[in-house]
Regions:
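N-terminal secretory signal peptides that target proteins for export/translocation
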Residues: 1-14
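N-terminal segment immediately downstream of the Sec signal-peptide cleavage site
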Residues: 31-100, 158-174
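Extracytosolic low-complexity repeat regions of secreted or lipid-anchored proteins
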Residues: 109-161
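Bacterial N-terminal signal peptides
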Residues: 18-29
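Mature extracellular/secreted ectodomains of secretory-pathway proteins
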Residues: 77-131
Length: 174
């Protein structure tokens, strides 16, 4: 009887130990996935990017939310393209269609974060056909623990040179 009790106790002990190790491994994996949900804002004033080949600029306004683990994004806003003289030649709306990547750079608080977001958008020009598959990069750089507002950027297609405006990321859920 005592041998049987020892065997059962040892079996339960080994099972509990294995279960504990499994739970510990799962917790370690979850804590190291760097799961995060962020909001991004283009505005205050809206960022402007220059196309160095044409001299045209694009002004992007809007906001969105993305999840780094689910690789999802929802976002929308408006845009305008101006010629090299500053006259608006196109207006429309944009919508986020695909999350690509996010490089978190931290920040002074969850409400103010730096980073680089890569996504794909569709442009809906007024009076024109939708333009799909357009790459967009939102940049809110942090250098040496401080924001570099001069390099904030919402690059869209060939519009890649920062030309003023504000972008910001907000950490909603770590």
């Amino acid at each position: 009887m005592s041998i049987r009790r020892l065997t059962i106790s040892h079996g339960w002990s080994a099972s509990l130990r294995s279960l504990g190790l499994l739970l510990l491994a799962l917790l370690f994996c979850v804590n190291n996935t760097k799961a995060a949900v962020y909001n991004f804002t283009l505005g205050g004033p809206p960022p402007v990017a220059l196309n160095p080949n044409t001299g045209q600029t694009i002004k992007m306004a809007g906001s969105g939310t993305f999840d780094t683990v689910a690789a999802s994004v929802v976002g929308a806003g408006s845009y305008s393209i101006s010629n090299s003289e500053g006259r608006v030649i196109e207006r429309g709306n944009w919508e986020a269609t695909q999350f690509s990547d996010f490089e978190a750079q931290g920040g002074p608080s969850p409400g103010i974060q730096g980073g680089i977001l890569h996504l794909t958008i569709t442009l809906f020009p007024k009076g024109g056909d939708p333009v799909t598959g357009v790459p967009m990069t939102v940049v809110c750089p942090v250098e040496d623990g401080a924001f570099d507002e001069d390099d904030d950027l919402a690059a869209v297609g060939a519009f890649t040179v920062p030309h003023g405006g504000i972008t910001v990321f907000h950490l909603l859920r770590p």
